[in-house]
UniProtKB/Swiss-Prot annotation:
The gene is metK. It catalyses: L-methionine + ATP + H2O = S-adenosyl-L-methionine + phosphate + diphosphate. The keyword Transferase applies. Mg(2+) binds at E12. This is S-adenosylmethionine synthase. The lineage of its organism: Eukaryota, Amoebozoa, Discosea, Longamoebia, Centramoebida. It comes from Acanthamoeba castellanii. Catalyzes the formation of S-adenosylmethionine from methionine and ATP. The reaction comprises two steps that are both catalyzed by the same enzyme: formation of S-adenosylmethionine (AdoMet) and triphosphate, and subsequent hydrolysis of the triphosphate. Binds 2 magnesium ions per subunit. The magnesium ions interact primarily with the substrate. K(+) binds at E46.
């Protein structure tokens, strides 16, 4: 148990082959196909998957022409479902497409006849961004480590290091922290959970041994592991049936994994399958940009940013900043709010232009998290120079 001066917090991650993540990637692959030849495409694409079936449905208005079947099958192939013996096969799965055009009621209220800068929010809602200085990524340690384990399992499987490893996998990490007046200090890794799909012909003993050698040790700094760290490696004892055969998948089923692993807050709106006129996505990216900029510039050790919108209205209804009491240099949260408002234009059209969100960059956001990644296309991860 953690001492009275410390706390335990847990985050989870899933591989790109988890059925919900498969659906996220299919939805975003379709979004990218739309944006590739029509940057102003309006896309709201949902995906569902189950044994031998992928269904995409929603509303899309685009000038792009592409083969839905090809996009979906290539995405499923990249994810790793290449043979029916592992529960799903991109070559033979049934694909259903039920796509209509965007509602004209939404179009007239949001973008028709309006300049880019005056673009209205695509819906109402509230979105959050979070940042913390506990890792170089300015992300929570629990989330970083859980994600790193999934990334490593993808490397191991793609490089055929463990022949028995199959695509579906989940991780979970509990970290013991010390809270120093709102600043979180990671002390040690308390518990590690890994569940990975496997072939019939491998023993649990072999799975646990090899996960420790090939996944955990290469992924986690040694100083965070100690003799008291608890490991639950394939604790169910059997995980042969996985992917959509094991459970149904839906777009937006892993919104906490997509963001901050349970830290901060979440407005409830998923990201994948939505073009940037949907503030569920674009404003959440902007809120992360603000939070990371505040922390990276040393104005706070932690930051939570909330923005809210009404459909068809370009300016946000509210902006909120909470530093958890960690504002630096004698500043207050009110000071950080003023700095945020003076440095960031949170109208949807300005967010889209500043972060170049009309590019086809979204499929790769749909696995291993939208935040804390070193990718030059993810402009919301580049701290802005702040004037104050």
């Amino acid at each position: 148990m953690a001492s009275s001066k410390t706390l335990l917090f847990t985050s989870e991650c899933v591989s790109e082959s988890h059925p919900d993540k498969l659906c996220d990637q299919v939805s975003d692959a379709i979004l990218d196909a739309c944006l590739a030849n029509d940057p102003y495409s309006k896309v709201a694409c949902e995906t569902a998957s189950k044994t031998g079936m992928v269904m995409v449905f929603g509303e899309i208005t685009t000038k792009s022409s592409f083969d839905y079947q090809k996009v979906i099958r290539e995405t499923v192939k990249r994810i790793g479902f290449t043979d029916s013996s592992i529960g799903f096969d991109y070559k033979t799965c049934n694909i259903l497409v039920a796509i209509e055009q965007q509602s004209p009621d939404i179009a007239q209220g949001v973008h028709v006849g309006r300049s880019d800068d005056d673009l209205g929010a695509g819906d109402q809602g509230h979105m959050f961004g979070h940042a913390t200085n506990e890792t170089p990524e300015f992300m929570p340690m629990t989330h970083v480590l859980a994600t790193r384990l999934c990334q490593r399992m993808t490397e191991v499987r793609n490089n055929s290091i463990l022949s028995w490893m199959r695509p579906d996998a989940k991780t979970q990490v509990t970290v013991e922290y010390r809270n120093e007046n709102g600043t979180l200090i990671p002390l040690r890794r308390h518990t590690v959970v890994i569940s990975v799909q496997h072939s019939e012909d491998v023993t649990n003993e072999e799975i646990r041994k090899r996960l420790m050698e090939e996944v955990i040790k290469p992924s986690i700094p040694a100083h965070l592991l100690d003799g008291e760290t608890i490991f639950h490696l394939n604790p169910s004892g059997r995980f042969v049936i996985g992917g959509p055969q094991g459970e149904a998948g839906l777009t937006g089923g892993k919104i906490i994994i997509d963001t901050y692993g349970g830290w901060g807050a979440h407005g409830g709106g998923a990201f994948s399958g939505k073009d940037p006129s949907k503030v569920d996505r674009s404003a959440a990216y902007a809120a992360r940009w603000i939070a990371k900029s505040l922390v990276a510039r040393g104005l706070a050790n932690r930051a939570l940013v909330q923005v809210s919108y009404a459909i068809g209205v370009s300016h946000p209804l509210s902006v909120f900043v909470d530093s958890y009491g960690t504002a630096q240099g004698g500043r207050t949260d009110e000071d950080l709010l003023a700095i945020s408002k003076s440095n960031f234009d949170l109208r949807p059209g300005k967010i889209i232009n500043d972060l170049q969100l009309r590019r086809p960059i979204y499929e790769k956001t749909a696995y291993h998290g939208h935040f804390g990644r070193n990718d030059p296309d993810f402009l919301w991860e580049a701290p802005k120079k702040l004037n104050f």
